Every structure is written in structure tokens, then in C-alpha cells.
């Protein structure tokens, strides 16, 4: 897992055309916000949304929430103008839709020389080219677009997301190999807390840093599931203490709760504590 100074447990989509939603987002408990100019905005509102969002980012206070702008694709009539408008905006990253190959990032990189780039991974071709995409020097994060991927695959929804597993796994491997942040796709039934929790647990078990969300009601569950639990923090501290004690006696392994603890487990334990500290710092900011 990449070390992160900022948590990405909850990444909330906000339509760039909705002034009330943009205002409300300033007080929500989201680690990051995706200000959406693409799927969430009707064609006849695209220009209005671009102007509204640019003004909002210049004047509104989103605190320490990570601000990501999802632009329209370069193959649309709005994509280039979006990039030109937000190249120097008060944002933390630009999210590019439907990235299928590393070349899709090149034109964007030239137009946005200073901001980190994130990629929407939502096409079958993108899954197959995940390693190539993740290796791009300007890329900082990946966002799984599971709705579009399901459409391409022609798959039916299953709670275990069986049809998604190969693509999710390829992107996770690529992201981890290149030290990128990677967040899971959305859960559409925003009133189904049990289903959301189960899918968040699955995503965390797989190794995602957090989950993209479509409704503020989903924030609490995502934040809880993707945070280290008190038990995990306590275990990490005990593992580190036991391993350091073993090292003082010239031993390379320790035993905690009847299980062998080696250096690789200590790396994970320290990452757990670092994530807990980052979350605590974010809450205090």
C-alpha cells in the first residue's frame, strides 16, 4: 500500500452544475470530492457547470478535503475547454474519464502541466492496459468506474461482483506496483446500508484505499470501514513492540497471539498506524 499523507476513505461525487450541492459539500465528512463535469451534467448544462465550478473553487472553502475535477473526455466538444479552464484552478487533481491506454493521458498532460492526473478505469481495454496506464509519470490515482465497466462487460449485478473481480484485481496490482492511490467504484443503492457496508468490506479486503460514493448518506459507513479499527491499531502496536523486543535479543521473528510476526508484518503494522495518524490529522484540520 502506498503511504498517503491524505486519507481517501470516502470520495464523494458532486455534480458541477448543482450550486446547492457544491455549497453543502463544504460541510460534509468526505475525505475527497470529485466535482463532476461529465456523467452527472446534462449536455445543455456543460458550459454553465464549468463556469459555476470554476467560480466555486476560487471562492469556496472546502478545508482539507482533496478536490478532484472530473472533466469531459477529449473526444467531446467540452473536454479541451474543461482542461483549459481548470489547468490552474484551485484543485488538487484532474480526473480523466474512460482511460483505455497510456496515450489517453498525453494530451491532457500537455494541457495541464502542473496538476496531478487521475484516471477513470472503466473500460475493458483499460483493464487490460492497467499496468501501462499506471506507469505514466503524471498519474497519481485511479478511480474504478464499475457502472461503465459492467455495461461494457454485459454483466449482471451480483453482491460478490464476480464479473468485476478480474478487472478490479488488475487495476489494484498496477496501482500498487506504481505507488498510486486507488479507490473502488460506487454502490448505487444509496439507501441500502447493509449492502454498502458489505461492498466496502469487500473493497477493503481487496486492498482499495477507499470508495467512491454517490450520496452523503454513504459517507459514515465508508469512513468507518476504511479506517483502521481500534483492534487493528492495538494489534499493530503489539506486533511492533514484540518484534523490536525480539530484535534486541538477536531474533528475526516474534510470536503474537500464536502467530509468527516477521518484518513484512511490521511493514503492514506501521502502515496501519500511519493511516490512523493521517485520519486523525485530517479530522483535526
Curated annotation (Swiss-Prot):
Reversibly inhibited by EDTA. Stimulated by the divalent cations Mg(2+) and Mn(2+). Its cofactor is Mg(2+). Its EC number is 3.1.2.30. One of its GO terms (biological process) is oxaloacetate metabolic process. Keywords: Hydrolase, Magnesium, Metal-binding. It holds the Pfam family HpcH_HpaI. Substrate binds at residues 70, 122. Induction: Induced by growth on acetate. It catalyses: (S)-malyl-CoA + H2O = (S)-malate + CoA + H(+). One of its GO terms (molecular function) is magnesium ion binding. Homodimer or homotrimer. PANTHER family: CITRATE LYASE SUBUNIT BETA (PTHR32308:SF10), LYASE BETA SUBUNIT, PUTATIVE (AFU_ORTHOLOGUE AFUA_4G13030)-RELATED (PTHR32308). Belongs to the HpcH/HpaI aldolase family. Catalyzes the hydrolysis of (3S)-malyl-CoA to (3S)-malate and free CoA. Inactive towards beta-methylmalyl-CoA and other CoA esters. This is (3S)-malyl-CoA thioesterase.
Amino acid at each position: 500500500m502506498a503511504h498517503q499523507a491524505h486519507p481517501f476513505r470516502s470520495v464523494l461525487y458532486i455534480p458541477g452544475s448543482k450550486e446547492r450541492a457544491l455549497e453543502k459539500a463544504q460541510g460534509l465528512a468526505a475525505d475527497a470530492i470529485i466535482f463532476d463535469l461529465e456523467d452527472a451534467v446534462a449536455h445543455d448544462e456543460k458550459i454553465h457547470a464549468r463556469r459555476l465550478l470554476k467560480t466555486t473553487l476560487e471562492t469556496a472553502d472546502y478545508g482539507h478535503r482533496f478536490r478532484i475535477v472530473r472533466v469531459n473526455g477529449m473526444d467531446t466538444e467540452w473536454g479541451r475547454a474543461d482542461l483549459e479552464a481548470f489547468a490552474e484552478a484551485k484543485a488538487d487533481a484532474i480526473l480523466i474519464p474512460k482511460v483505455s491506454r497510456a496515450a489517453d493521458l498525453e494530451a491532457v498532460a500537455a494541457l495541464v502541466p502542473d496538476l496531478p492526473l487521475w484516471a477513470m478505469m472503466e473500460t475493458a481495454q483499460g483493464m487490460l492496459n492497467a499496468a501501462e496506464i499506471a506507469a505514466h509519470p503524471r498519474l497519481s490515482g485511479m478511480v474504478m468506474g464499475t457502472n461503465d465497466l459492467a455495461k461494457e462487460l454485459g454483466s449482471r449485478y451480483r453482491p460478490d461482483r464476480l464479473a468485476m473481480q478480474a478487472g478490479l484485481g488488475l487495476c489494484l496490482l498496477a496501482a500498487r506496483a506504481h505507488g498510486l492511490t486507488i479507490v473502488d467504484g460506487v454502490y448505487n443503492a444509496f439507501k441500502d446500508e447493509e449492502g454498502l457496508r458489505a461492498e466496502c468490506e469487500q473493497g477493503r479486503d481487496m486492498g482499495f484505499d477507499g470508495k467512491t460514493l454517490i450520496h452523503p448518506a454513504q459517507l459514515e459507513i465508508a469512513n468507518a470501514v476504511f479506517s483502521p479499527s481500534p483492534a487493528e491499531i492495538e494489534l499493530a502496536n503489539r506486533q511492533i513492540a514484540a518484534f523490536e523486543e525480539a530484535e534486541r535479543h538477536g531474533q528475526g521473528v516474534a510470536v503474537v497471539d500464536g502467530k509468527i510476526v516477521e518484518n513484512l508484518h511490521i511493514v503492514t503494522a506501521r502502515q496501519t498506524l500511519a493511516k490512523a495518524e493521517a485520519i486523525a490529522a485530517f479530522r483535526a484540520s
